[in-house]
């Protein structure tokens, strides 16, 4: 595989980080910076999200430079094929080739995307494998992410969980307790790192919006977009929301979602404004000033908890029928709304009224820890040799 990356060979541990989507760039932003500080580090991007608004803009937002001094990963690996089988095959084949060539001493992945399946290559090559966001489960087999989670959790040498819920789940399935750690979510550190930029964003002026006079929408998950029944149910509910509140609904729209809407011919209410995907700083400025946020994003519960912790609560409503973040529900940080009109309107009404009355949850401790990147690099540094000795019988 053609690339220009070479290790510095400065004596530090050689760590490769694999990712391939916008959420991974966001969640890993602080960890990548910390790894570059303490490791001989290589970041590989598998380019699942190839659109500039879903990739390039986020390297820039977080000022994530590669070893060549440019915004972006050290190695860009094209993997997207004409179908899922080809894409997953490319991820496995090309990651195996790259890992075989560069032989990192540790390989780090986060989450449940198809890019995380590159972990299989690291495992087969006996490279110590570290997994962030381990143990998350929504118990919904319709979600492709649920399959990926199980695969990567089981094969990882060290699992790093956000919450006690996740750690207990892994322990109950028989995975080694001595190599499973609760680190907390990396999102608070990422949000705090960019908070000044978020607050300075002029996105409201650029889009002609006013504080508390719009609703922010994000809907992109496969179960909401690709299922005909769920798609019609959700966007019928969105139209009803526009009718009831009679204000702009700004839809930060993923290219796949936009294509699905165009192909379906579904007529959105004129008050629903379909917008290109927004950058991290702009999107969070919009979240902080919206009357309510309606989203199927996995980061919503964590963002809601963070904003609550800094005295800026948001009315967060999740348009899903399951969640892998029960700890945030337990803390009262968001409402799980479902996707029918009745469910969504009731949830929105409740979220807005509670915010206005100051009836709030409490910040989830797992979501407001700003030392996660430090924990991650320490765990990696400490366990590379342990895994080599105890798992692979090296040395």
List the predicted regions and their residue ranges.
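Donor-nucleotide binding loops and adjacent catalytic segments primarily
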Residues: 48-51, 56, 199-289, 394
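A donor-sugar binding/catalytic signature common to diverse glycosyltransferases
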Residues: 108-110, 116-119, 131-132, 159, ...
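A nucleotide-sugar donor-handling region in carbohydrate enzymes
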Residues: 2, 48-53, 78-79, 152-229, ...
């Amino acid at each position: 595989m053609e690339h220009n990356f070479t290790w510095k060979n400065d004596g530090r541990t050689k760590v490769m980080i694999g990712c391939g989507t916008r959420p991974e760039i966001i969640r890993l932003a602080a960890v990548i910076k910390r790894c570059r500080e303490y490791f001989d580090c290589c970041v590989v991007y598998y380019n699942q999200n190839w659109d500039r608004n879903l990739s390039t803009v986020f390297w820039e937002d977080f000022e994530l430079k590669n070893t060549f001094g440019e915004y972006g990963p050290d190695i860009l690996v094209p993997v997207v094929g004409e179908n899922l089988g080809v894409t997953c095959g490319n991820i496995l084949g090309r990651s195996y080739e790259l890992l075989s060539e560069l032989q990192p001493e540790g390989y780090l992945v986060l989450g449940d995307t198809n890019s995380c399946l590159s972990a299989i290559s690291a495992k087969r090559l006996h490279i110590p494998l570290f997994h962030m966001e381990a143990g998350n489960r929504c118990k919904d087999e319709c979600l492709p992410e649920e399959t990926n989670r199980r695969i990567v959790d089981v094969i990882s040498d060290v699992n790093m969980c956000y919450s006690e819920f996740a750690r207990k789940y892994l322990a109950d399935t028989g995975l080694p307790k001595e190599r499973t750690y609760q680190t907390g979510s990396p999102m608070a550190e990422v949000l705090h790192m960019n908070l000044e930029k978020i607050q300075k964003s002029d996105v409201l002026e650029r889009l002609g919006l006013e504080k508390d006079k719009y609703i922010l929408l994000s809907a992109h998950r496969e179960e909401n977009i690709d299922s005909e029944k769920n798609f019609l149910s959700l966007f019928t509910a969105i139209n009803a929301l526009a009718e009831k509140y009679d204000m702009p609904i700004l839809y930060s729209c993923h290219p796949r979602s936009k294509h699905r809407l165009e192909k379906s011919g579904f007529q959105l209410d004129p008050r629903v404004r379909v917008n290109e995907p927004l950058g991290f700083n702009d999107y969070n400025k919009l979240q902080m000033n919206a009357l309510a946020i309606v989203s199927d994003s996995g980061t919503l519960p964590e963002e809601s908890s963070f904003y609550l912790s800094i005295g800026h609560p948001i009315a967060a409503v999740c348009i899903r029928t399951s969640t892998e973040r029960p700890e945030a529900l337990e803390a009262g940080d968001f409402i799980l709304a479902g996707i029918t009109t009745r469910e969504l309107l009731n949830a929105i009404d409740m979220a807005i009224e509670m915010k206005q009355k100051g009836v709030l949850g409490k910040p989830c401790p797992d979501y407001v820890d700003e030392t996660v990147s430090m924990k991650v690099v320490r765990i990696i540094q400490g366990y590379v040799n342990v895994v080599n000795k105890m798992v692979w019988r090296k040395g």
